[in-house]
Structures are given as C-alpha cells and as structure tokens.
Amino acid sequence: MSDAFTIYLRNEESVLLMQRADGVADFPGAWDGIYGIGDPEDLDAVVARITEVTGIEAENLQFVRSGDARGLAFGNRLNDVTPMLFVSSVNEVDARGLYKSFEWVDPGNIGTKEYATPQLSDMYGDVASYLYILKTSIGQEQNVAKEIQARLSGTGSLKDIQDEIYGVLSPHFMRGYIFVEASALHHVEKLIGRVGVSTTPMKNLSLIHI
C-alpha cells in the first residue's frame, strides 16, 4: 500500500503547482503538486494536508479520483506515491510549511518546469487522462448534468457508450463547470452531440481539453 500521495488541485481550467522551500531535505526549490505522507484512502487526512499547506478550507474542496501509486526516487529511497485529483472553488493560496510559493498553470505546461519532483507531469496524466471538463452557463450546471444523465439512461443511439462513461460530477461550488469521467474523448464528444449525426448537440456547452 502507498504511504504517500501527491495532490493535483484544479480550479476551473488551471492546476496548482507548489514550489518547495529552499531548506527542505528533498528537492529544495523544486516544483511539486501537494505532497503528503500517509494513507491516500484517508480523504479527511488528505484534505487536511491541502489546508495545511495552502490555506484552502475543506468546504472549498472536492475529491475527483486517484491513480495507481508510482515508485519515485527520493535520493537513495524509493517511495510509493499515489497521485490524487481534487477540484477547488477558490484560487487564493497561502503557501506554507513545505512550500514557499505557488503558481496556477495550464495543465499542458506542467512538464515545462525545469526543476520539478520526479514524474510530476506523468502523475498528473494518471489522474487527468480520463477526465473531461465541460463549460456551460453559470446557473445551468445541474440542468446540464441531468440532461447528460438522461441521455445515458436511454435506450437509443447512446446505449453503446453507457459503459464508457464512468461518472458525471457537478461540484456545487464550481459554477459553470461539469466534469465527465470517460474512457476516451470521442465518447464524451458523442454524448454531447459534437460528433456523428444521431445525437442532438447540447446547447451552451463547450468541451475543454486538458
């Protein structure tokens, strides 16, 4: 079982990177997610770690998914680290503890950091590769989510992708955004009517590529 985790925190279309303090033992000054030691299945402890180093309170956070642990080299040690994905309703951060600064970045730019903790970009891919973000009008999130669920529960042309859509998440605090977990992009595109001719396109909805 993994005894450590790295959290990737998303706010709308950006992901949070934290820069380690200069005086820490491992990777001083390196860019990181939010690193913590402990059981990644203990979500209360994981959320407490986020609050500890960012100041973001639990009511502004929602867990999305975790990936398989990776063995990462920390000096002469090999640590099993589990990547985890959360969404946040706020982007105000107070970097403290292990970290000295922070930056909200486009997910595609994670790999451009010259000095980062091991496999930082790859681990983000482990938790984000099957997550797709839909942007809609503020106030219409629940209606759109219900329409998506209704499409999935039918017996028509979308029946063949029902097993490919794993979940639809509409965090109450993320105004204007819906998260869809699916096995591939083209299934989401079919679901919302962006490919093919058999599905009516959903209005006021755009797909954000992450």
What label would you give each PLM region?
Residues 128-207:
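Acidic-enriched and Gly/Ser
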Residues 83-87, 94-126:
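NUDIX/MutT-family hydrolases
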Residues 14-53:
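Conserved Nudix-box catalytic region and its N-terminal flanking loop in Nudix hydrolases
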Residues 3, 77-86, 103, 130-132, ...:
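Short beta-strand micro-motifs in enzyme catalytic cores
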Residues 51, 55-92:
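Active-site segment of metal-dependent pyrophosphate-handling enzymes
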Residues 1-17, 37-40, 83, 89:
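Conserved N-terminal beta-strand and adjoining loop/helix that marks the start
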Residues 10-15, 23-24, 69, 89-93, ...:
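Short, charged/polar surface micro-motifs in flexible loops or helix N-caps
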